[in-house]
Amino acid sequence: MEMILMVSLCLTTLITLFLLKQFLKRTANKVNLPPSPWRLPLIGNLHQLSLHPHRSLHSLSLRYGPLMLLHFGRVPILVVSSGEAAQEVLKTHDLKFANRPRSKAVHGLMNGGRDVVFGPYGEYWRQMKSVCILNLLTNKMVASFEKIREEELNEMIKKLEKASSSSSSENLSELFVTLPSDVTSRIALGRKHSEDETARDLKKRVRQIMELLGEFPIGDYVPALAWIDRINGFNARIKEVSQGFSDLMDKVVQEHLEAGNHKEDFVDILLSIESEKSIGFQAQRDDIKFMILDMFIGGTSTSSTLLEWIMTELIRNPNVMKKLQDEIRSTIRPHGSYIKEKDVENMKYLKAVIKEVFRVHPPLPLILPRLLSEDVKVKGYNIAAGTEVIINAWAIQRDPAIWGPDAEEFKPERHLDSTLDYHGKDLNFIPFGSGRRICPGINLALGLVEVTVANLVGRFDWRAEAGPNGDQPDLTEAFGLDVCRKFPLIAFPSSVI
């Protein structure tokens, strides 16, 4: 009996010590986690997100700090809201944060995540990105499409001149979607959407895909509520849009195969690479379709959204508009009415204006999320593998500690003597991201935007259509994968040529 009591006491002591050790370990780990707001059972911090997540996350960061830990349902989310913290994620530990989280939308719409933008990090992704950069996005290749950009921009200018002659307004938001869509369609498919039914259908499908990628399916974060995505039609829309896009691209690829391989557009180039087996790994036909989709997403949304915000800010800030017009119009005279891409190379104020719009209106205010592949310390905090990371570029680029007390103001002059570029070297300015996952299509987007703004501002004076704020365009945002204006930008052009 005495022996049994002794053994029981020893076992009880050992179990107690083990449980105490586990408790202390968990407590120590929790103490070393980033600050977190309180959360609700089941849904975590989802209730604290607004229709504009970049703004609500910024508000939370002002209270809990530039590195905070949220929970969307059962998923831990590390929110980064300062350049200093972003430095550790995107530079110091870039490889550990190089993966992408899996989501229902990406899996259903993006070939199971086998594309470049949303695909998981690994050898296959590195090979695919290399194919894109070396064959599609080199400076030489981007420059070779200047004639296409010029032709499509001239088409838009003709519409504006017609509106000017009749003193009528134009929906600039609509024009800014059409222009990059036509340019991208001609570069990628060899046809423009406004003149071809297949290209028009493809534009529609790309828009639907972007809208679905910008939605927030509850099942990704709270599996117990995944039935809601079925009831509200999200799952059905994913299936319908994905199949519709795949069928369209099958048709496009087949037409290119039947026409012969002349390496005239991106589809031809990719088919040539596939047939020559020259890329060092086996690319599937579906890979081609989704590389083209990546191009449409990157080539249309960034350019159209940026153009919309540039013209919004210029009309709202007539002094900036006048200064930019003076710079551009001094260039027009010796070169005729159309400004070419080589003419904008030395337009410092134009480049400063575009940079400032990227700062205050980044098309992707929340950089596409990353997934931590192994445990790591960030700013002294323990971050566990499997944590998703959201970098709030919108908050970083409005940080008064970096940009000064006028950080909320639109002020292009701050960039005139700046060495900032678009390649993510300075983590306080990351409109295209940084590190391994930086957007590879920077030059493609900038090439169209710069020459478009130069011609719009150089050839026309502008006046916004009267609205609730008089002739001042408002700054109300819509939200999706990219953040454009909620209401169309309607303005009156007045030709000065």
From Swiss-Prot:
**Chief site of localization:** membrane
Q: Does the keyword Lipid metabolism apply?
A: no
For whether the record's keyword set contains GTP-binding, the answer is no
**Knockout or disruption consequences:** 90% decrease of all indole-3-carbonyl nitrile (ICN) derivatives and increased susceptibility to virulent Pseudomonas syringae.
Q: How does it sit in the membrane?
A: Single-pass membrane protein
Cite the Pfam families for this sequence. Answer: p450 (PF00067)
Gene3D superfamilies tied to this protein: Cytochrome P450
Q: Which cofactor does it need?
A: heme
* TM region positions: 4-24
Cite the entry's keywords alphabetically.
Heme, Iron, Membrane, Metal-binding, Monooxygenase, Oxidoreductase, Transmembrane, Transmembrane helix
Instruction: Tell me where it resides.
Output: Membrane
Question: What are its GO cellular component terms?
Answer: membrane
Return the EC number: 1.14.-.-
Q: Which domain of life is it from?
A: Eukaryota
Task: Give the molecular function GO annotations.
Answer: heme binding; iron ion binding; monooxygenase activity; oxidoreductase activity, acting on paired donors, with incorporation or reduction of molecular oxygen
Q: According to its UniProt record, which protein family does this protein belong to?
A: Belongs to the cytochrome P450 family.
User: PANTHER family under this entry?
Assistant: CYTOCHROME P450 71A2-LIKE (PTHR47955:SF15), CYTOCHROME P450 FAMILY 71 PROTEIN (PTHR47955)
Per the entry, what this protein does is: Converts indole-3-acetaldoxime to indole cyanohydrin. Involved in the biosynthetic pathway to 4-hydroxyindole-3-carbonyl nitrile (4-OH-ICN), a cyanogenic metabolite required for inducible pathogen defense.
The name under which this protein is listed is: Cytochrome P450 71A12
UniProt source species: Arabidopsis thaliana (Mouse-ear cress)
Its taxonomic placement starts with: Eukaryota, Viridiplantae, Streptophyta, Embryophyta, Tracheophyta
